[in-house]
Regions:
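Solenoid-repeat scaffolds in large eukaryotic assemblies
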Residues: 77-81
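Long, non-catalytic architectural segments outside compact domain cores
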Residues: 1-57, 61, 83-110
Length: 110
């Protein structure tokens, strides 16, 4: 049996294009939600919570990287880590990516 898993919301794909491992990690949590049997909590809500949780993890990781970069004193590392932390902070807000119709329809219709 082939299962068509949902795709990561387009806005997240766009914003994370330089972080393919992050996209893969988001896809993993969506696949888990899609494969999990129905429960009292709607799948769309579970998918949103799963993405928000993983995005929160990305933010925490980016903060750690920023702290490490600051400790190194290397201006290039600091600038790169600040840019990454800023991006992760931005995408953590669901209004940035929740307008993806394909995502919403997939989880509403499953």
């Amino acid at each position: 049996m082939t299962t068509n898993f949902p795709r990561v919301p387009a806005k997240l794909l766009e914003k994370l294009r330089d972080y393919p491992d992050h996209i893969e990690r988001l896809q993993e949590v969506l696949n888990i939600v899609a494969a999990t049997p129905p429960s009292l909590i709607p799948r769309l809500e579970r998918a949103i919570e799963a993405l928000q949780g993983r995005l929160g993890t990305f933010m925490a990781e980016a903060r750690r990287e920023l702290n490490q970069a600051r400790s190194s004193g290397d201006p290039r590392l600091i600038a790169a880590a600040q840019a990454k932390a800023s991006l992760m902070s931005q995408i953590r807000l669901k209004h940035v990516w929740m307008t993806d119709k394909v995502f919403s329809v997939y989880f509403s219709g499953v």
